[in-house]
């Protein structure tokens, strides 16, 4: 089981995670890739299937976060309209997000995302909470 911890304060965010992975047969291994990464100014902590975070770590550059936002609603707009669609496009291109036509988009990971000192929890259906 993965543990990702994130704390948001006034003008700062800190995030940490364990470094163990468990295979389906219960063997435990120490991971070579971290569960918390910095991708183009976006801090991403991942849990669930390791493939999702691997894809965000290798071969993908996150959209650059906006430098100045006046309201958190503007940051929510960036998450909804820029970051999440770019992430999903990468997952689809790499075969990680595959769905039948009559189903909703889904992956098998959960992410904690820190951008501009604001934390988001991104669920497997691409919905988020702040």
Predicted regions: what they are:
Residues 100-123:
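Conserved phosphate-donor
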Residues 1-105, 127-130:
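Conserved short S/T/G-enriched processing/targeting/catalytic segments and their helical context
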């Amino acid at each position: 089981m993965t543990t990702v911890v994130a704390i948001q304060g006034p003008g700062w965010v800190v995030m940490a995670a364990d470094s163990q992975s468990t295979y389906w047969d219960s063997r435990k291994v120490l991971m070579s890739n971290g569960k918390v990464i910095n991708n183009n100014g976006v801090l991403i902590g991942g849990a669930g299937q390791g493939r999702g975070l691997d894809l965000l770590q290798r071969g993908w550059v996150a959209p650059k976060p906006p430098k100045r936002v006046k309201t958190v609603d503007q940051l929510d707009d960036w998450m909804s309209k820029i970051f999440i669609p770019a992430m999903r496009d990468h997952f689809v291109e790499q075969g990680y997000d595959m769905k039948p036509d009559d189903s909703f988009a889904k992956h098998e990971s959960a992410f904690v995302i820190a951008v501009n000192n604001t934390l988001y929890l991104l669920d497997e259906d691409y919905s988020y909470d702040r």
